[in-house]
Amino acid sequence: MFRYLCLISLGLAACGPPAPAPILLFTGGGTSPGDVAALQAILEENHLAYATANSWQLNGITESRLTAYRLLIVPGGNFVKIGDRLTADATATIRRAVQSGVNYLGICAGAFFGGDSPYNGLNLTGGVRFGFYSAENRGIHKAAVPIADAGSGTLDLYWEDGPQLDGWGAVVAKYPDGSPAIVEGMSGNGWVVLAGIHPEAPASWRRGLIFQTPVSASRDYSLRLIQAALNRSPLPHY
């Protein structure tokens, strides 16, 4: 009996705890529940394993635990609230983890937060701070925007109060006014992809707007961004 228990113990020790999922999706304060759900749907449809973390969990995570993941995704929402719900220690931990090799995908609010936001941002951009896309100045808060991608031509993608990403990284896609809509680059040893638009947007978000690009093509584009960030694969750029 003792020998049997020892064998079980040794077997469990050899197996160890399960490896973490490769992707950590932030679901905490300030994130849009609808955007979290849209990203979860794409991850699950494409069999990409992921874990989630809310603000409390991210505030308590250690750098060694965070660096066990390959990619951190911060979705859309309110970048002011995202920063406010995290401690300065937490954002410093995330920054160190990215610069140690964790990759980062920031979508809309997540892109603002990835820059040098004054609201406890991550500053993965060496001090570059992003402003809103110019449509905001015309009183427009959501729109179907034709985005010129360097590799795949023009796609109509959903935009809602998102940033233009001028001043950092290689430009993957542009807004109609020529400002960057998607950028990529290194932050230390981490690969960073920032998007001012929402290619993951479901059909329900399109009501009242006119798109030339079908939802399926938009969601495929979202998957492409996720895989590029996860696998550190540079996208075609200008």
Indicate residue ranges for each PLM-predicted region.
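Sec-dependent signal peptide recognition
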Residues: 1-7
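Class I SAM-dependent methyltransferase SAM-binding "motif I" and its flanking Rossmann-like core
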Residues: 115-153
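Helical hinge/lid and interdomain linker segments adjacent to catalytic or ligand-binding clefts
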Residues: 25, 32-118
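Short catalytic/ligand-binding loop motif for oxyanion handling, primarily in non-cytosolic enzymes
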Residues: 81, 113-116, 121, 133, ...
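Extracellular ligand-binding/catalytic regions of CAZymes and related secreted enzymes
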Residues: 21-23, 37, 95, 121, ...
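Catalytic beta-strand/loop cores that center a nucleophilic Ser/Cys/Thr
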Residues: 139-205, 238
